[in-house]
Curated annotation (Swiss-Prot):
Residue segments, region Disordered: 234-423
Composition bias, Low complexity: 405-423
Organism of this sequence: Danio rerio
Function (record text): Associated component of the WMM complex, a complex that mediates N6-methyladenosine (m6A) methylation of RNAs, a modification that plays a role in the efficiency of mRNA splicing and RNA processing.
Subunit structure comment from the entry: Component of the WMM complex, a N6-methyltransferase complex composed of a catalytic subcomplex, named MAC, and of an associated subcomplex, named MACOM. Component of the MACOM subcomplex.
Keywords for this protein: Cell cycle, Developmental protein, mRNA processing, mRNA splicing, Nucleus
UniProt-recorded name of the protein: Pre-mRNA-splicing regulator WTAP
Bias-annotated ranges (Polar residues): 239-276, 285-301, 358-377, 392-404
Intrachain S-S bonds: none
Keyword match Transcription: no
Cellular compartments annotated: Nucleus speckle; Nucleus, Nucleoplasm
């Protein structure tokens, strides 16, 4: 069937038409009816071909929805059953509680008869009456303090409250400002005090550094003096040995020479002691910066020690005795004692010179003790004082020159004494 052909129409035949129409007309009507039926069948086929897939999908969706709805229905039924069961349990519990709470006549009678319960109820009644009285009093006070915005008393009270609040704020500001000023003043004082403490601490540190430098210089000078003293002692011991050997080799020939021997021995001893005292005074005045009175006192004390040494060991007056070797040994011993005492006076003079150092911290005794202790352990201080000697090069040079001169004077005196003893 094409689009140009008209659409067939439904053929309708009544009973009268079936009787009146001829066979040919009936055939034509039948053919029209067949075309109409074919057209309907074609339309139905077209509709079936287009909508079968959609109908299947919709059918599957409907089946899934039906299954979900059935599952939900089952879940809801189960929940409903559980809720009904819980409701039944709650109703049973409520009934049980009602039965329990409804006391029987015997329970009521026993509770009324019990004196403890009666006392408890009486106390509860008294407390209830007290609370009611307090509540009424509080309500009366509240109603008395209530006022409307238009009332004059309320306005006055509000103005008074505002004024009091302002005064309180002003007083708080004044107090805070006064406290802040006081704290600022205290802070300034503390800062000033801390600055003063810092300055004093710096001064003390400088003073301590200066004292350390002075002590190091003194230690270096003490070390140098100890070395010089050791060298002089070695020289004296060597000279004494040479003198002893020379005195033993040359015997006395004439008595006048032996008679003049004590005077010649005493004079060089006195001269050597005086020279040593002068040199020691010069050395002690070098590092200790002593005055002239200290120098005189040190020289006189050293001279006294030398003279006392001469008096302790006087020479024998016998000139031509056969024990001339013993006399010469005794004179040598006296010279050794004089030299030893001169060395001791030298050490005491050095300690006295170091005691005259001005130290405000009261460390004079420690310095002298250190100078006395360093005589025994000079070897241990040599390695420590050698790098520090560069700080006191001038002082060391001056003291070394003085000690060199003193050592030369002692050597000349001892050589003169040995020559006199030989003569």
């Amino acid at each position: 069937m094409t689009n140009e052909e008209p659409l067939p129409k439904k053929v309708r035949l009544s009973e009268s038409d079936m009787k009146t129409l001829t066979r040919e007309e009936l055939c034509t009507r039948w053919k029209q009816h067949e075309t109409y039926v074919q057209m309907l069948e074609a339309k139905y086929a077209d509709l079936n071909s287009n909508d079968v897939t959609g109908l299947k999908e919709s059918e599957e969706k409907l089946k899934q929805q039906q299954q979900e709805s059935a599952r939900r229905e089952n879940i809801l039924v189960m929940r409903l059953a559980t809720k009904e069961q819980e409701m039944q349990e709650c109703t049973t519990q409520i009934q049980y509680l009602k039965q329990v709470q409804q006391p029987s006549a015997a329970q009521l009678r026993s509770s009324m008869v019990d004196p403890a319960i009666n006392l408890f109820f009486l106390k509860m009644k008294a407390e209830l009456e007290q609370t009611k009285d307090k509540l009424e009093q509080a309500q009366n006070e509240l109603s008395a303090w209530k006022f409307t915005p238009d009332s004059q008393t309320g306005k006055k009270l509000m103005a008074k409250c505002r004024m009091l609040i302002q005064e309180n704020q002003e007083l708080g500001r004044q107090l805070s400002q006064g406290r802040i000023a006081q704290l600022e003043a205290e802070l300034a004082l503390q800062k000033k005090y801390s600055e003063e403490l810092k300055s004093s601490q710096d001064e003390l540190n400088d003073f301590i550094i200066q004292l350390d430098e002075e002590v190091e210089g003194m230690q270096s000078t003490i070390l140098v003096l100890q070395q010089q003293l050791r060298e002089t002692r070695q020289q004296l011991s060597q000279m004494n040995q040479t003198q002893g050997t020379s005195s033993g080799a040359g015997p006395s020939r004439t008595s006048p020479s032996t008679a003049s021997e004590p005077s010649t021995q005493s004079e060089p001893a006195n001269a050597s002691s005086s020279n040593v005292g002068k040199d020691c005074g010069r050395v002690s005045n070098g590092p200790s910066n002593g005055n002239s009175s200290q120098r005189g006192a040190s020289g006189s004390s050293l001279y006294r020690e030398a003279s006392s040494a001469d008096e302790d060991y006087p020479p024998s007056p016998s000139v031509s005795s056969p024990t001339h070797d013993g006399i010469s040994k005794l004179s040598n011993h006296s010279e050794d004692a004089v030299s030893q005492r001169g060395g001791e006076g030298y050490v005491t003079q050095l300690s006295a010179g170091y005691e005259s150092v001005d130290s405000p911290t009261g460390s004079e005794t420690s310095v002298t003790q250190h100078s006395n202790d360093t005589d025994s352990n000079a070897d241990s201080h040599e390695a420590a004082a050698v790098p520090k000697g560069s700080r006191t090069a001038g002082t060391r040079h001056s003291t070394q020159n003085g000690l060199d001169s003193s050592a030369a004077a002692v050597a000349t005196n001892t050589s003169n004494a040995s020559a006199g003893s030989v003569l």
